[in-house]
Amino acid sequence: MKSLQKGFTLIELMIVVAIIGILAAFAIPAYNDYIARTQVSEGVSLADGLKIRIADNLQDGKCTSEGDPASGEVGNTDMGKYALATIEGTPDANLAGLTPKDPNGCKVKIEYGKGTAGDNISPLIKGQMLVLNQLVNGSYDKDSSSTVKPKFLPKALKEATP
């Protein structure tokens, strides 16, 4: 009487390994892009938090302030896990004559890789910079000096960029 063999043949196992390899070839780059996009979004969130500081500073006719952390004042920067956001620029002298979608002269520069966990940042955006112009209506538009690739930007910034 012949015994029945159980299990997979070598060719079946090789086919499964090949299929897993093909799937990984697509999944790993997509996952790396996803990580980079989430880290860029963290920097944009930092910039959103700076909007109120810019509005307060504009009341004094400037974009930046000399904050004293010892007295409870906040400065021109916000640091996140992967990025450092800094307020820069000089307000336009003719703010009253601008339309809501015109830049007001204030900018937020986001530097990736300078956060508290900067060593763990995606290599796709490490050392990259995103510069956002604040518009009169308070929203942001991407500046042409930005080095972050457009595919990593949040949808709102992609649509706002000409």
From Swiss-Prot:
GO terms for biological process: cell adhesion; protein secretion by the type II secretion system. It is a single-pass membrane protein. Keywords: Disulfide bond, Fimbrium, Membrane, Methylation, Transmembrane, Transmembrane helix. Induction: By PilR (PilR/S system) and RNA polymerase sigma-54 factor/RpoN. The lineage of its organism: Bacteria, Pseudomonadati, Pseudomonadota, Gammaproteobacteria, Cardiobacteriales. Pfam families: N_methyl (PF07963), Pilin (PF00114). PROSITE patterns: PROKAR_NTER_METHYL. It is found in: Fimbrium; Membrane. This is Type IV major fimbrial protein FimA. It comes from Dichelobacter nodosus (strain VCS1703A).
